[in-house]
Amino acid sequence: MSVEQSLLGKETQYPTSYQPDVLFPIARAQSREKYAHIEGITQGKDWWHVFEISWLNAHGIPQVAIGRITLPASSPNLIESKSLKLYFNSLNFTQFDSTQSFIETVEKDLSAAAGAKVELTLFQVDDLEISKPQGICIDDLMPERLEQHPDATLLKLDESDEEIEVELYSHLLRSNCPVTGQPDWGTVFIRFKGKKPCYRSILAYIISYRQHNGFHEQCVEQIFADIWQNLQPEKLMVYATYTRRGGLDINPCRVSDLTWMPKPIRLARQ
């Protein structure tokens, strides 16, 4: 299905009965065509936090939780966010015999939409803790050049020719939803092993996304691919934690080496 057929940016009625068919898959293949040869572009996970989960227990009493969805980057489809919100709304008045029954139903429906096994972990509403970023924040550096759209030529190696392993992060990631034009804000983590990159050039590159139209997952994959091709690290991880919209936040992560998969976190802006 094409994104133009989705419910993004359109007035919709919120379902009050279970409707798994509202889920809208979007194929990953088209946006990945020019990165198909990049090692790691399909390695990783998309973590979603769902803050508006509710269903009825066997006695008809409302239950609430925070959910973490884990969707493999190797899945043929991602799931459009508004359709996911509507799907969870459709469960608000549906009775389940147990919490496990609720989890199994959601996992079955999301796996069918994604075309791969999707996992749901539930947290009590007070239990999903806020983490602090680890690594070197590059936001106070001064880039040599600024662009308003992604420009891989901004990426440079440091003049020292030093071999390093480092984790950098920036809170300055901004891009736009390709359908509604609404801004998406995020923190991006970059773990890098290889010849030392110029940190100012990486910041300039991140800033260049400010007027770019792309889904969260696509932006992370483009960042990963551009760094991989232009800075040629031995190992690379790119992980973005986007702020919440409509009760959901999306956190894509791509890695060249599966041993570099981080644990999912939740930051203060989420």
Curated annotation (Swiss-Prot):
Its EC number is 1.7.1.13. NADPH binds at S81, K82, R245, G246. One of its GO terms (cellular component) is cytoplasm. GO terms for molecular function: preQ1 synthase activity. It is found in: Cytoplasm. It comes from the Bacteria. It catalyses: 7-aminomethyl-7-carbaguanine + 2 NADP(+) = 7-cyano-7-deazaguanine + 2 NADPH + 3 H(+). Pathway: tRNA modification; tRNA-queuosine biosynthesis. One of its GO terms (biological process) is tRNA modification. Keywords: Cytoplasm, NADP, Oxidoreductase, Queuosine biosynthesis. Substrate binds at I79, E80, S81, H216, E217. It is an enzyme of class 1 (oxidoreductase). HAMAP family: QueF_type2 (MF_00817). NCBIfam families: QueF. This is NADPH-dependent 7-cyano-7-deazaguanine reductase. It comes from Acinetobacter baumannii (strain ATCC 17978 / DSM 105126 / CIP 53.77 / LMG 1025 / NCDC KC755 / 5377). The gene is queF.
